[in-house]
Amino acid sequence: MFKIKLTSKAKRELRKLSKEEKLSIGEIIEELKENPLIGKPLDRELIRKFSYRVGIYRVIYKINQQDKIVKILSAGHRGTIYN
């Protein structure tokens, strides 16, 4: 099982979400603890990062396999997550 770490940016983004949105993102994070490779590998300026989607929500993250850490970089609505 992987540990989850959130960047300060991800924490700020999560604070802005509604309770329902936070629950959806929380489900994504729980799944990433078990299997962080289920996300889609990103490319271009986001190389070595992953995106995991549930409905209209996305979580952008990096994986540290050696230390078993998933670092959440950004979380929120798919329309604003890549800005």
What are the language-model segments listed below?
Residues 29-52:
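A short, surface-exposed loop/turn module that caps and links secondary-structure elements
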